[in-house]
Regions:
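Membrane-embedded alpha-helical segments that form the functional core of polytopic membrane enzymes
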Residues: 2-53, 88-89, 139
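Juxtamembrane transmembrane-helix termini
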Residues: 10-13, 72-76, 101, 128, ...
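C-terminal membrane-associated helical module and adjoining short loops/tails
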Residues: 106-189
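Membrane-interfacial alpha-helical segments at the cytosolic side of multi-pass membrane proteins
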Residues: 5-11, 63-73, 116-124
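Hydrophobic side chains within alpha-helical segments
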Residues: 3, 33-36, 58, 62, ...
Length: 189
């Protein structure tokens, strides 16, 4: 939750690369935390229930609110981006409501993939030039639709989850290395 908050703060300060690195790290921590929680023996039902709901709130910040803040700052708060921002927020809220429907498979595409895509998009931003904003807007619209689509989506497990988390960590490292405000990392080299 704290890392997601700092990612939102960084994007509002105009530090998009740092913000993306932080939100990628938040997704990795979310996946590791979930893995650990499922393996914790002897957790009482109340704590399990609380943890699932609290996790969902934290996810909504990193995978719902953060992408919208990224869009709004990238478009300099242009009014044209507001309907898309609201649509995306509603789609992600609906997607997370599926988490609490008993005996139901995971429906729609996980918002984790949106974060990975946004990291890649941030890295490609200089090459995209004026196509960056339309690409970002189309991506958010597409991911919003996929998040609430009626197809079942498998949950990443085992080595697939490890690979995805490692991919996000590499993206975070590349984003940090390219962040203009992070020159102190290489100052002594």
């Amino acid at each position: 939750l704290a890392i997601s908050f700092f990612a939102c703060w960084a994007v509002l300060l105009g530090r998009s690369a740092l913000a993306m690195a932080l939100v990628a790290l938040a997704v990795v921590i979310d996946n590791v935390d979930g893995w650990m929680a499922r393996r914790t023996v002897g957790r009482n039902l109340a704590l399990k229930h609380f943890g699932a709901h609290f996790d969902c709130y934290a996810d909504y910040i990193s995978k719902g609110i953060f992408p919208v803040l990224y869009l709004l700052t990238a478009t300099d708060l242009q009014v044209v981006s507001i309907p898309l921002a609201l649509t995306y927020l509603m789609a992600i809220a609906v997607r997370y409501s599926y988490e609490f429907v008993p005996d139901r498979d995971h429906i729609g595409l996980s918002p984790d993939y949106m974060i990975a895509f946004l990291c890649l998009l941030q890295l490609a931003a200089p090459q995209l030039g004026s196509a960056f904003i339309p690409t970002l807007m189309a991506s958010l619209a597409g991911f919003a639709a996929l998040a609430v689509a009626s197809f079942p989506s498998p949950k990443l497990k085992g080595w697939a989850l490890v690979g995805f988390c490692l991919f996000l960590l590499v993206l975070a490292a590349v984003l940090l290395a390219g962040d203009q405000g992070m020159n102190w990392l290489t100052a002594g080299l």
